[in-house]
């Protein structure tokens, strides 16, 4: 094989690597191919979202669910009102969703990740400690007050904690109509069927008694 052929082969291999690793990193939801496609939630979703409704009206493009107040009398002292394709079908194929997140004093939105979206948010009221962790276990965090904004890169574990003495509120947005949410405590200890104790005791370097106690708190 000549030097020119070897160089050409290496160049093609390099292009293949670029295509495999770079192009997926730029993607989020697929781009729409029409002005809108209000989701028909009675139909089964496809890979790009729900099929379009046969007829639409102005009400399909407006949503009032981000108002408050929400009931924050929950175990974690937090409540979320989502505006995603399942609650607001007008978002179907548009690659966008939002949440209203409200905290009681001391309330925590526990460590979780959104596998299909980057998250951006703004504090509407209160003081919120926001943090996310990178894949090398570095924590980036800051206390934010009303009017201040944060961003969490796609898929990274993050949390929010109301460090104030009064309620706090965030409005968050995502570059996906259905970003998904994997909440670490309930994912690990409340799965159905449950993760075997042997896996969890080894992972967390603890015993069956501790694992069973945690499972009892997150049992579905």
UniProtKB/Swiss-Prot annotation:
Mn(2+) binds at residues 112, 114, 119, 158. Disulfide bonds join 37-52. SUPFAM superfamilies: RmlC-like cupins. May play a role in plant defense. Probably has no oxalate oxidase activity even if the active site is conserved. Glycans are attached at residues 71, 136. Keywords: Apoplast, Disulfide bond, Glycoprotein, Manganese, Metal-binding, Secreted, Signal. It comes from Arabidopsis thaliana. This is Germin-like protein subfamily T member 2. One of its GO terms (molecular function) is manganese ion binding. The keyword Hydrolase does not apply. It is found in: Secreted, Extracellular space, Apoplast. PANTHER family: GERMIN-LIKE PROTEIN SUBFAMILY 3 MEMBER 3. Gene3D superfamilies: Jelly Rolls. GO terms for cellular component: apoplast. Belongs to the germin family. InterPro entries: Cupin_1 (IPR006045), Germin (IPR001929), RmlC-like_jellyroll (IPR014710), RmlC_Cupin_sf (IPR011051). Residues 1-27 form the signal peptide. Residues 64-212 form the Cupin type-1 domain. Oligomer (believed to be a pentamer but probably hexamer).
């Amino acid at each position: 094989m000549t030097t020119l052929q070897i160089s050409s082969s290496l160049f093609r291999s390099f292009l293949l690597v670029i295509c495999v690793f770079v192009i997926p990193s730029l993607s989020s939801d697929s781009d729409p191919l029409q002005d809108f496609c209000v989701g028909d939630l009675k139909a089964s979703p496809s890979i790009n979202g729900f099929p379009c409704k046969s007829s639409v009206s102005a009400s399909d493009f407006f949503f009032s669910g981000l108002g408050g107040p929400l009931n924050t009398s929950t175990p974690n002292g937090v409540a979320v009102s989502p505006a995603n394709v399942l609650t607001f079908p007008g978002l179907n194929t548009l690659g966008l969703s939002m949440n209203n997140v409200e905290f009681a004093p001391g309330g925590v939105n526990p460590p979780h990740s959104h596998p299909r979206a980057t998250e951006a948010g703004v504090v509407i009221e209160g003081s919120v400690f926001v943090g996310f962790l990178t894949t090398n276990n570095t924590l980036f965090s800051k206390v934010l007050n009303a009017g201040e904004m944060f961003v969490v890169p796609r898929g990274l574990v993050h949390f929010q904690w109301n460090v104030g003495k009064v309620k706090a509120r965030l409005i968050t947005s995502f570059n996906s109509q259905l970003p998904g949410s994997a909440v670490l405590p309930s994912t690990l200890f409340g799965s159905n069927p449950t993760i075997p104790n042997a896996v969890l005791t080894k992972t967390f370097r603890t015993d069956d008694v501790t694992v069973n106690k945690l499972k009892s708190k997150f049992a579905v």
